[in-house]
């Protein structure tokens, strides 16, 4: 448990430094019919409840923050090259439960403002390299704290195209 907590803390600190991310608090619920609770797979059914002080208006427990993050970036007037990160606690009652899926989701997430001309494969790869560097730094710091957890990741990330995979 201690290692898990340290990995989470180290990684968010490393990534927020690499990608200029600001930590923001995510909502646990949003108002129904605002469009902020993404319908991830077309059949998501949100957990709903009335809010007494709002004339019993209906709120939904979040199951995705994709749209909310973009709205938050706009509200904060986040310039290109900067972004946000958050912890989302969600309920997904439609989830198929197995050894890696639960109806409860504790998900760390981030979003960054980019310019239209940055929507390129080159920029995506540059961002992936920065994320990978954050993972590598986290792995190395974890090794210092827990020497039994040896670093295993290669020095550099390798990109492969789906066509190359088909030819294998």
Predicted features along the sequence, with ranges:
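Hydrophobic residues within well-ordered alpha-helices
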Residues: 11, 128-131
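Class II aminoacyl-tRNA synthetase-like tRNA-binding/catalytic domains
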Residues: 1-101, 109-113
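Non-heme Fe(II) oxygenase catalytic core, chiefly the N-lobe of the double-stranded beta-helix
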Residues: 102, 124, 131-135
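Well-ordered alpha/beta subsegment
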Residues: 115-125
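Short, surface-exposed, polar/charged, turn-prone segments marking secondary-structure boundaries
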Residues: 88, 112-117, 137-141
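Metal-assisted phosphate- and nucleotidyl-transfer catalytic regions
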Residues: 31, 130-168
């Amino acid at each position: 448990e201690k290692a898990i907590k340290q990995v989470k803390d180290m990684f968010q600190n490393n990534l927020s430094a690499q990608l200029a991310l600001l930590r923001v608090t995510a909502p646990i619920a949003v108002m129904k019919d605002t469009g902020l609770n993404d319908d991830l797979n077309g059949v998501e059914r949100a957990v709903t409840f009335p809010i007494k002080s709002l004339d019993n208006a209906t709120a939904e427990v979040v199951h995705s923050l994709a749209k909310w993050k973009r709205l938050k970036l706009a509200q904060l007037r986040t310039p290109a090259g900067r972004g946000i990160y958050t912890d989302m606690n969600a309920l997904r009652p439609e989830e198929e439960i197995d050894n890696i899926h639960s109806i409860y989701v504790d998900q760390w997430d981030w979003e960054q403002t980019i310019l239209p001309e940055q929507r390129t494969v080159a920029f995506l790869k540059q961002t992936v390299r920065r994320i990978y560097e954050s993972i590598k730094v986290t792995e190395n710091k974890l090794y210092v704290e827990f020497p039994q957890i040896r670093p295993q990741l290669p020095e550099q990330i390798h990109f492969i195209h789906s066509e190359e995979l088909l030819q294998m």
